Amino acid sequence: MYSSVVHLARANPFNAPHLQLVHDGLAGPRSDPAGPPGPPRRSRNLAAAAVEEQYSCDYGSGRFFILCGLGGIISCGTTHTALVPLDLVKCRMQVDPQKYKSIFNGFSVTLKEDGFRGLAKGWAPTFIGYSLQGLCKFGFYEVFKVLYSNMLGEENAYLWRTSLYLAASASAEFFADIALAPMEAAKVRIQTQPGYANTLRDAAPKMYKEEGLKAFYKGVAPLWMRQIPYTMMKFACFERTVEALYKFVVPKPRSECSKPEQLVVTFVAGYIAGVFCAIVSHPADSVVSVLNKEKGSSASEVLKRLGFRGVWKGLFARIIMIGTLTALQWFIYDSVKVYFRLPRPPPPEMPESLKKKLGYTQ
């Protein structure tokens, strides 16, 4: 199974052309069938490591942050748009559980009433909103991670790395949600209010006419409640899971793994992180869905009305959606980094100075 997943990773569209050279002969000259044999080829892993050192920019440079933001646009915009049908059913289960009783029932009712085109409702605000969110989420995460690491210093950055991941991701998501909120509000109106509007072009002017700018940003606080814990879990859990996989599961160091093998680890760690993300952020997601559907309601009123059981409606659908979503996002984001030859630091190791202080080395 592992080899088959590696094969899929090799075939991913973001596989960098320079990596293929390793397999095609960069690792060592091939022997000419008509001439004397050439020198033995170096191992593929060592050659891959040599290529890996040829980065297109410095870690923490402006170009690095811009390309990370581009990776966020591609990873978030495409994946969220691809899962619009599941997201639509999930939202309808949250706002009208009597009508949409389960995932399968929700799909059945939607297909019966709206046809296959109905499953794509809200794709435009989803694509625009989550592309903007991905730009800020991944781009600013890298910015804040470097900023906070420099503030802490090498030793403290290692000792407090989980807190560093949590702080950097929370800071990034704060700004990402401001970019997402208007499109998220329009998406929920389109998906959950029959007859309100079928397109973003129809929904946005109507929302502004009815409630002004408040219509687009009244859900930003619940969005922070949903997305900041989600993103903190997404990044911190992913970073520590990658670290654990290389330490306890993968049978060789990361430096000896090929790029496709590293991307498989990325995908697995992303899915594990996604499951926890869905659970942590689901209650706030339910509040956001109901709040954006109704006029004049507040987050506290919606939360009180839904109750403990109500806020967990649609959790199974969201676990499937967010698990798949998070895994694909990390896979695509890491693939973009590989394609543009961006620095991809290995899992953190204890600094030598700290090892000496703790008596691990002489």
UniProtKB/Swiss-Prot annotation:
Gene that encodes it: SLC25A3
Segments in the Mitochondrial intermembrane topological domain: 50-63, 142-161, 239-261, 334-362
Feature: transit peptide: 1-49
Stored InterPro entries: Mitochondrial_sb/sol_carrier, Mt_carrier_dom_sf, SLC25A3/Pic2/Mir1-like
Modification N6-methyllysine occurs at: 112
Repeat region (Solcar), residues: 63-147, 160-244, 261-339
GO MF entries: phosphate transmembrane transporter activity; phosphate:proton symporter activity; protein-containing complex binding; symporter activity
Lineage: Eukaryota, Metazoa, Chordata, Craniata, Vertebrata
Name of protein: Solute carrier family 25 member 3
Claim: Mitochondrion is one of the keywords in the record: yes
Organism: Bos taurus (Bovine)
Protein's GO biological process: mitochondrial phosphate ion transmembrane transport; phosphate ion transmembrane transport
Localisation: Mitochondrion inner membrane
Segments on the Mitochondrial matrix side according to the record's topology features: 87-121, 184-218, 285-314
Stored Pfam families: Mito_carr (PF00153)
Transmembrane segments: 64-86, 122-141, 162-183, 219-238, 262-284, 315-333
Family, as annotated: Belongs to the mitochondrial carrier (TC 2.A.29) family.
Functional description taken from the UniProt entry: Inorganic ion transporter that transports phosphate or copper ions across the mitochondrial inner membrane into the matrix compartment. Mediates proton-coupled symport of phosphate ions necessary for mitochondrial oxidative phosphorylation of ADP to ATP. Transports copper ions probably in the form of anionic copper(I) complexes to maintain mitochondrial matrix copper pool and to supply copper for cytochrome C oxidase complex assembly. May also play a role in regulation of the mitochondrial permeability transition pore (mPTP).
Protease among keywords: no
